[in-house]
Design a protein with these regions (language model features):
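Active-site neighborhood of glycoside hydrolase catalytic domains
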Residues: 467, 479-592, 599-602, 606-607
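Consensus positions within tandem repeat domains that build extended binding/scaffold surfaces
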Residues: 79-80, 100-103, 123-128, 146-148, ...
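Acidic, contiguous N-terminal accessory segments
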Residues: 210-356, 571, 577-581, 714
Length: 714
């Protein structure tokens, strides 16, 4: 409570605080950074690691007004103010020369920007998604990158002081309502702007470029078979579309109509195209047929045929039909650098997945993900045929799922102050009703939702409310840093099993997936030592005949705890347990799914899976940890020492790990990408960390090795 009282005081102080002037962010205390609302920096600004910009972005979370006019900074770095939602006003450095890509991405309260005279380049997506940006003034003639000012819903005035139009990508102003924007330029230069790429869109004279798509260049993941008939007449996508769907495909028909509306101009209630102009005027009749075909070899298999007058998609199941639609959607989008494609060549796709589980894991415990933002994550997953969303709902830092039997868990353990050096309020949880709705929403996209409740470690949030869960029975505060706690649930205390049983009873009712994840990781050195001295744990070991004293006895005790919970989940709730594999596990309980996650220890985990006749999902850190930076110096610039997981490293993942066909047939469960959120402090940052690596993961999980090519993927 004391921490939240102090936050209220800080917020009150911040609201009345006048602009603070300092040379650099290091001149402010942590508390003043957190409370700052208005700042002026005058020094030479640092741009790497824990730079002035990283501190402005991640530590000064309440910042609304920033004056950098007197600061020395030739280059505003990439992601400088990425998704800083409070920022309203900024004065850029007078001597600025370049604005990096995504520098102000999703700063959705920013109201005005003036680009200084000396700026020569505005990077890709630099101001994309600044929804309340009303006025843009460009004093020089900088080159404007792809989507530099895209998706600005509120922009009303753009003033350019150069008589010669600045060079602009065709997509520089994509997603802007051109009719609602006043473009002001020097007298006598309108003719040049009318003809200039990027700028001509403001005059309503140039149709945005559309083209015949190149299927080989736009499909991710790569399909098993693709045959293009380049000599045949392409399908012109603008026309009067109707969708004909077999029984049982009502959901897929809705998706088909949505895709056609978004990509070709739409359908009205009678299946007629609502788009004005184009082939629709001529009354081109186009049909999309959705059907089931039981002869296909896999439950997710589909065929897609593009004909001159329509599209035929067949699937073994509704899931296969849906994935055919996702492939069609990508064909309509082309390479995504333009508004879309006018035509698709006649072709046939025959496709099915290599693995049947292609998962992403998100972590709302370290930094909470609001419900609507969590929902927004789903369509992009489905677009690339990712089909499992793993929710890490419990950890040392928060308990984020409502448990009606234990209301104190969310009342007291779902909020805290700060995450490492980010002194900000972090709070939120999901109600059971929200999760029921979320599960149903995901099902429409053929994604199943798997909840995770950690045990026996990573449970400090629960322990902070119910100290009787621990060996010493001492209340511990919620953890506000990353790392591993030395607290465990007490294996010798029957309340632990009662508590977990009640939690899983409610989860089993909310989440219909056949899988529940039990955690199980990082309960070893030194944490298991708390079981060594616990009288209850010692008594249980004696009862079980566990007599070894080389610390293996504690792993055996963890095995006992797991055995009891696994038996409960199987017999009462018909669930298949999952857990993170540790090399100290000497057995994998029959029927369970284990995760190979520790970097450098994947082979050991796979061998254990084979020896135990178990299924295993691959998410090794060196390939699949998407919270890690994608390149040196990338976000998160400050972390606990994360290595780099590059796009190439993710793409290079071989789900079979060279173990052969028998392993792939009998043991391989799937692949997963993990998004731990210790250093991810906004929903937009989740997307930044997830993509494009999730695309590489999708191809690794779906596409057969012989069809994959790094050069083709790029």
């Amino acid at each position: 409570m004391r921490k939240f009282i102090s936050f209220a005081v800080l917020a009150l102080m911040a609201s009345s605080m006048s602009a603070q002037t300092v040379a650099n962010m290091k001149d402010l205390s942590a508390e003043k950074k957190s409370a700052a609302v208005s700042l002026k920096l005058t020094g030479t600004l640092t741009t790497t690691r824990n730079s002035d910009f990283r501190q402005l972005r991640d530590l000064a979370w309440q910042l609304r007004d920033l004056d950098l006019s007197e600061a020395t900074c030739p280059v505003l770095p990439k992601n400088a103010f990425h998704s800083r939602h409070h920022l309203q006003h900024i004065i850029l450095p007078n001597q600025l020369q370049e604005i990096g890509s995504q520098a102000f991405f999703a700063c959705d309260n920013l109201q005005e920007v003036v680009i200084p005279q000396g700026v020569t380049k505005v990077g890709a997506a630099a101001f994309s998604g600044c929804k309340k940006l009303k006025t843009i003034t460009i004093n020089g003639a900088p080159e404007l990158g792809e989507f530099a000012f895209a998706n600005l819903e509120g922009v009303k005035l753009i003033k350019v002081n150069s008589k010669i139009p600045p060079k602009a990508a065709a997509t520089a102003f994509s997603g802007i309502n051109m009719r609602g924007v006043k473009l002001v330029m020097p007298k006598g230069s309108e003719k040049l702007y009318r003809k200039a790429a990027g700028w001509n869109a403001f005059f309503g004279e140039v149709k945005q470029a559309r083209e015949v798509c190149n299927p080989e260049a736009c499909l991710i993941p790569t399909p098993m078979e693709l045959e293009v008939n380049a000599k045949a007449t392409p399908l012109q996508v603008a026309g009067n579309w109707k969708v004909v769907a077999a029984d049982g495909l009502a959901n897929e028909q809705e998706h088909a109509e949505r895709i056609l509306k978004e990509r070709t101009g739409g359908l009205d209630a009678y299946g007629k195209n609502a788009r004005k102009g184009g082939n629709a005027k001529q009354g081109s009749e186009l049909t999309m047929t959705l059907a089931l075909d039981e002869s296909l070899p896999d439950k997710e298999a589909y065929t897609l045929e593009i004909q001159q007058k329509g599209v035929v998609i067949k699937g073994k199941t509704a899931t296969g039909v849906f994935y055919g639609l996702m492939t069609f959607d990508q064909l309509l989008r082309g390479d995504a650098s333009k508004i879309g494609c006018d035509a698709i060549p006649q072709l046939v796709v025959k496709d099915q997945p290599r693995t049947h589980v292609r998962e992403l894991m998100v972590d709302p415990c370290r930094i909470f993900i609001p419900y609507e933002d969590l929902k927004a994550f789903v369509p992009e997953m489905a677009r690339y045929k990712l089909n499992m969303l793993h929710l890490h709902l419990v950890d040392d830092q928060a308990w984020t799922i409502e448990i009606k039997k234990y209301p104190r868990l969310t009342a007291e353990a779902s909020s805290r102050w700060g995450m490492d050096d980010m002194l900000m309020p972090i709070k939120g949880y999901y109600t059971q009703e929200q999760m029921r709705d979320f599960v149903a929403y995901c099902a429409k996209y053929h994604i199943q939702v798997v909840p995770e409740i950690e045990m026996p470690g990573h449970e400090v949030a629960a322990i902070s409310v119910y100290p009787e869960l621990t060996c010493k029975g001492v209340r511990k505060p919620i953890r506000t840093t990353c790392g591993v706690s030395d607290e465990l649930l007490c294996a010798g205390n029957e309340f632990t099993y009662e508590f977990l049983g009640n939690v899983f009873k409610e989860l089993a009712d909310v989440f219909p997936s056949e899988y529940i994840h039990l955690g199980g990781d990082e309960a070893g050195n030194p944490a298991l030592d708390c079981w060594t001295t616990c009288p209850k744990c010692q008594a249980l070991k004696k009862k079980l005949g566990i007599t070894s004293t080389d610390r293996s006895e504690n792993w055996k005790l963890q095995g006992y705890l797991f055995d009891r919970i696994i038996d409960l989940l199987r017999t009462q709730y018909h669930k298949t347990p999952m857990f993170w594999y540790e090399t100290d596990f000497k057995k994998i309980q029959p029927g369970c799914v284990t995760f190979a996650w520790r970097a450098g220890l994947t082979k050991e985990a796979l061998v254990a899976a084979v020896e135990n006749n178990a299924r295993i999902l691959l998410c090794p850190g060196e390939h699949c940890y998407f919270d890690y930076p994608m390149a040196k110096g990338d976000m998160p610039e400050v972390n606990w020492g994360m290595p780099v997981t590059s796009l190439k490293a993710t793409y290079d993942l071989d789900p079979a790990w060279g173990m052969g066909e028998d392993f792939e047939k009998n043991n391989l469960f799937g692949v997963a990408g993990t998004l731990w959120s210790e250093c991810i402090n906004s929903p937009e940052r989740i997307y930044y960390q997830a993509y494009p690596r999730s695309l590489a993961l999708a191809e690794a999980g779906w596409s057969f090795q012989k069809n994959r090519s790094w050069e083709g993927f790029l």
